[in-house]
Amino acid sequence: SRGLGDVYKRQMVDSYIEQGFKYFDTAYPYHNGRSEETVGRCLVQRYARDRFLLASKMPVWLVKEYADYEKYFEEQLKKCQVEYFDFYLLHAMNKDRVKEAENLGGFQFLQSMKAEGKIRHIGFSFHDKADVLDEILTNHPEMEFVQLQINYYDWESENVQSRKCYEVAEKHGVPVIVMEPVKGGTLANMVGEPARILSALDENASYASYAVRYAASLPNVILVLSGMSDLKQLQDNTAYMKDFQPLTDKEQQAIGKVVEELEKLPTIPCTNCRYCVEGCPKKIRIPDIFGVYNMGVQFGLTDVTRGSYRCQIDGSGKAGDCIKCGKCEAQCPQHLEIRKLLEEAADIYEKEMHL
């Protein structure tokens, strides 16, 4: 996690492994390109190779020719200090990226690395509609797993299509690894009626626990990824997943009611993937601004949310700086109307705060 020293990161790794967990997920761009090196220092140097499973991903948007696959892959092995990846993915595939990967030989590259023993299991992470996923899995039966955005809020969403994508994978007999089970942290922070509904089930259970268990309860899910920023989150996650219990009927019904309540709130369904940030000519930290926007919707315009907004625009562009070029919208896996939403954020915060 950004800003944490290696000593703390090692504590998190140790706590996780001591409790019997072993899967670590990284990728080329995570944490400004430093995540894989951190994995090398804090995990790989300190544990025998059979103590952990390591996944990383090919940054397909950087690939211009077949040789680039080799270049980035070798760089990733070196950064992580491993001779092979247990799981390796083509990163953030959608309709356009899959065509590029097919034209440049991305799928063949994964198969060749598997044949050489440098990858144990090949797959891809996916951000698009279910019909695109169906086409990919039909054309590429060699794919052993798919990583999908699944959470109870997006299950019936026409934007994300969690359920439809899950059912496509199930139809093809391809196991699912879940990402975004807590929807970028959104489902870990409940107030009002949603908070009351979940607290009534068990006042000691975290809101995040219901979201992660929801995803883990699906039969074709082999693994649920959950981003953990500190030891407290890690200890909470590992406590309820060590002795995993699928959701009961009562819990499923409660989650249904929570979704009904959440849908009444006009929050922005941003997952903080940050693909929109890279090409922004005004250096606007779009997901961070949307995060504060959502805080305002959920908790009101308070000193905390105002302070958070000031913090997010410190040293970078504010929402009102947007020139509406649309580069961000072309990158957004959630297909959000970012330009319009930035205008709304500027209206709420910048006018009120005279920025």
Stretches with model-predicted labels:
Residues 37-56, 109-112, 116, 171:
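Alpha-helix-loop-beta-strand connector modules within alpha/beta enzyme cores
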Residues 14, 18, 61-182, 189-196, ...:
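Glycine/proline-rich, positively charged
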Residues 30, 46-67, 91:
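Structural motif corresponding to the early beta-alpha repeats
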Residues 25-26, 56, 178:
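Hydrophobic residues in well-ordered beta-strands that form the structural core
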Residues 23-43, 94-98:
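Glycine-rich, proline-tolerant flexible connector loops at the mouths of alpha/beta enzymes
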Residues 1-8:
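Short, small-residue-biased leader/transition segments that mark boundaries at the very start
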Residues 23-30, 120-124, 147, 223-225:
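Short catalytic-loop micro-motif centered on adjacent basic/acidic residues
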Residues 12-22, 41, 164-355:
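Structured C-terminal cap/extension of enzyme domains
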